[in-house]
Amino acid sequence: MTPRQDTPLPIRIGTGERGGTFYTQGLALKAALKRIPHAPDIEVVESSAGVSIENANRLEAGEIDFGFIAAPWVVAAKQGTAPFTRAIDIRVAAPMNLGPNFFIARADSGLRKVSDLRGRRVAVGMKDGGMAPHAEGVFAALGIGPDDLDRVYVDFAEGAEMLATGTVDAQFQCPIPNRVMSELSERILVRVLTYDPPHLDAALKVIPHDRRIIMRKGAVRGLDQDVPQLGVLNLLVTHARLDAATVQRVVGAIILAAADLGRLDPLFAGLAELIETFRGERQAADFGGAGLHPGALRAYQG
């Protein structure tokens, strides 16, 4: 007779490519929640495809319980628009971080602004990932068409290597601090490309739920002034079918662990303030119909 298993299964959280920002945040979540009494055990699940938008499809398939996704792709998943082929009944659990997506070039290049990318080779991320369509939103806002630059579809690490060796002229980077960006800036001097104010305004109109954010002087080696950039809000999401008690338990533990998470991973700095914006129903309507899961609402109102 098979003995009864009393140990609950761990909560599976889908992240991104190994070593990427979502993956390291997932590891920090696992570590922080271990310190919270009665919090569930966490299994960090990397993306086999190296892309975080895969998490929406894995939620639909029941392969994970929660997943990291940037806010614009939460909207796309809920509404079934590109890059998704069908609507997914996704729900928001918690904010994870707000950070800049930004273009970098070698400091010894002639590139200074995003508009200078015309005619250049740019590493924009994986073709089926979240970064590439984000970059396309920027290009569209600036009137940069399909034939105006050469898009190179590679992961963050390969894109950084290509920039270091001069194989590409620029790279679209994810929020800092991240290991790839830190290691690259120690190898070569880089320049963060800036936006003309009308171009940044146009990009904010094109890309839903991005926010203006200030990238502070010294945030990466060689950045010698504060510069406004596109800020992406990254979210922890789940499927509508996941039971409210489980969601409430996970979100409640994240709320309790917010300060600890900020110490474990600088990407979580400011998490407590972001959580406060989720303590009302108005924020829940901000993601294209993908509102807060009922269990998350209970956690915020508890």
Language-model-detected regions and their locations in the chain:
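Acidic, polar ligand-binding/catalytic clefts
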Residues: 61-98, 108, 178-179
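An extracytoplasmic/periplasmic, membrane-proximal ligand-sensing/linker region
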Residues: 154, 158, 165-166, 175-188, ...
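Extracytoplasmic
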Residues: 8, 51, 61, 87-88, ...
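Bilobed "Venus flytrap"/periplasmic-binding protein-like clamshell domains
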Residues: 8-36, 42-49, 99-165, 265, ...
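Short, low-complexity disordered leader/linker segments with a strong preference
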Residues: 1-8
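Pocket-lining segment of extracytoplasmic ligand-binding domains
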Residues: 71-73, 81-82, 109, 146-243
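Divalent cation-coordinating acidic motifs and surrounding scaffolds
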Residues: 43, 48-67
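Ligand-binding clefts/hinges and TM-proximal coupling segments of bilobed small-molecule sensing domains
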Residues: 121-137, 209-279
